[in-house]
Amino acid sequence: MGTSQAVDSSPPDGTGVIQLDPWLEPFRDALKQRFSFIEGWVKAINETEGGLETFSKGYERFGLNVQSNGDIIYREWAPNAVQAQLVGEFNNWDVTAHPMTKNGFGVWEVTVPAVNGAPAIPHDSKIKISMVIPSGERIYRIPAWIKRVVQDLSVSPTYEAVFWNPPTEKQYKFQYSRPKRPESLRIYEAHVGISSPETKVATYKEFTSNMLPRIKYLGYNAIQLMAIMEHAYYASFGYQVNNFFAASSRYGTPEDLKELVDKAHSMGLVVLLDVVHSHASKNVLDGLNMFDGTDHLYFHGGGKGRHELWDSRLFNYGHHEVLRFLLSNLRFWMEEYGFDGFRFDGVTSMLYTHHGIGTGFSGGYHEYFGSSVDEEGVMYLTLANEMLHNLYPNCITVAEDVSGMPALCLPHSLGGVGFDYRLAMAVPDMYIKLLKEKKDDEWDIGNLSFTLTNRRHGEKTIAYAESHDQALVGDKTLMMWLCDKEMYTHMSVLTEFTPIIERGMALHKLIRLVTHGLGGEGYLNFEGNEFGHPEWLDFPRDGNNNSFWYARRQLNLTEDHLLRYKFLNDFDRAMQLTEEKYGWLHSPQAYVSLKNETDKVLVFERAGLLWIFNFHPTNSFTDYRVGVEQSGTYRIVLDTDDPAFGGLNRNLKETRFFTTDLSWNGRSNFLQVYIPTRTALVLALEETL
């Protein structure tokens, strides 16, 4: 049964998922309880706030908002404070000038009257909220809903809040509508600050002019932007967020980011934000921690509110105002900046009370129910997906979860959490394990195939061979595992094509292609990895003398025609463009007809294409018999051994392969093909070329 059929016929109690996965039958009551708990929150929000649509527009009520007459209304939730004042350069930081009043829900408010019809707080001027807490201490904080903060490292690493309200003529005006949602999602994961070969922090403007055309040329149709939400510590890779409504100022202004998103849309690229709602920076002076003098405003109090490994604060998803803050944060990034969706970071930490720390997941269904599940975290993620998909039907949401929770990518109506895709996190781990622990002739083709195809029925998966995680210092990219130090000496076409480089380039292409073809309903690549970027990522920090040497992407390597990186880059482009033509990512899962452990040959069919992989390190096979369902004449549409991709050209592009009407490996026909060592061929019926 398909997902849409299940939705149509499912009972209205959250147990519809059982029709798709009967193994969930023993957990019927738990599914009902989960569904009922979430519905209870939906009902409460409908009754008290007028529904998720109104509730998620908190940024129009909280923070600083300019009225049509020029007045500025500032509201802040800080129930523990006994006094509160808005201070800034506009009133010489005078704590008596703009006192705030508190309502019964702990929300403080002040109106700053306009001066001659214009806002009294100048654009880009510094502001803070000053509060007195019950002990009598006066504290200063950055407004929780602030839209811009800036950092002057020559003065202090602490961020300062500024009032962002540029004059009309300096406000970026969006010119392009959102592209339609891609049927096949091909994601280019990128970090603005490292997107330059120079040893510096690159800017939004530079990304717009340099990276967008590159991503479009490579054939990707989606960009996933990391480290956009403001984070004081650059080396955190954006995962220790201080200010949730502020776009990082180290790359430029909010208007620059709007231009980036708009220009991406003009190229038909959708833009996803890497959103971090799994935890927050523990910073006090420029974060949410201890905001009103308590440790339990936005977060759980005590140890429950601290993540042991990340050294950060954990949100209390079961609090009405925290839900308002987080749901409004998602809505804000969609509305203000025009993002097309989100990749949710650290979902495993949100789903479980143990946060995945010291816990392995066996796949036993009992692990997904019971006391170890954070039902409030599940509820928040479900409400987030409900809100986003109801308001923005083309919105894309991706979950980073290692646990394999059932129904994560099914709609709430079936008892699911509502994500569109989950990341196939076991796949890159498999490749690292193979390269670290196995000789090439020990590769288990059956396990390779199983890992790539082991995904939940009806739930979409984004496959990837490696992401930013594998590029970070302390780990190695696939190309570094494959070629190691020879990357520095033998990637020139003027040098010997050594066995190590030949093997490395061949397997780099094979790994990417088999992942793309077999691994999911979407594909992701981290910038630079498409061409085998040398070295790792290491941001400036005390441990490396604040060096930018490894905090950059040497994208210029592909432009040097004397280097072999161009071959890998061109192969990656051909792979994306071939997918665009044949659409295997949105086709049904592949039929695998052969997993030959002796020959190290893998054969499967998907989207009308025949995929043939020879992973054997030394053996090539002549007239190798391969089963195929559809009869006819086949031609090569992609060949990893093509000289255009640095290959040895052992199969001619013009070769025709004719089927024979005899069954083979469970298929109605077979054809015979020459498959050289460490190569892959993708064949298509001649009439589809």
UniProtKB/Swiss-Prot annotation:
The record marks D469 as: Transition state stabilizer. One of its GO terms (molecular function) is cation binding. The keyword Transferase applies. It is found in: Cytoplasm. Its EC number is 2.4.1.18. (1,4-alpha-D-glucosyl)n binds at W93, K128. Pathway: Glycan biosynthesis; glycogen biosynthesis. The active site is at D345, E400. SMART domains: Aamy (SM00642). One of its GO terms (cellular component) is cytoplasm. GO terms for biological process: glycogen biosynthetic process. InterPro entries: A-amylase/branching_C, Branching_enzy, Glyco_hydro_13_cat_dom, Glyco_hydro_13_N, Glyco_hydro_b, Glycoside_hydrolase_SF, Ig-like_fold, Ig_E-set. Pfam families: Alpha-amylase (PF00128), Alpha-amylase_C (PF02806), CBM_48 (PF02922). It is an enzyme of class 2 (transferase). Keywords: Cytoplasm, Glycogen biosynthesis, Glycosyltransferase, Transferase. It catalyses: Transfers a segment of a (1->4)-alpha-D-glucan chain to a primary hydroxy group in a similar glucan chain. Glycogen-branching enzyme participates in the glycogen biosynthetic process along with glycogenin and glycogen synthase. Generates alpha-1,6-glucosidic branches from alpha-1,4-linked glucose chains, to increase solubility of the glycogen polymer. Belongs to the glycosyl hydrolase 13 family. GlgB subfamily. This is 1,4-alpha-glucan-branching enzyme. It comes from Aspergillus oryzae (strain ATCC 42149 / RIB 40) (Yellow koji mold).
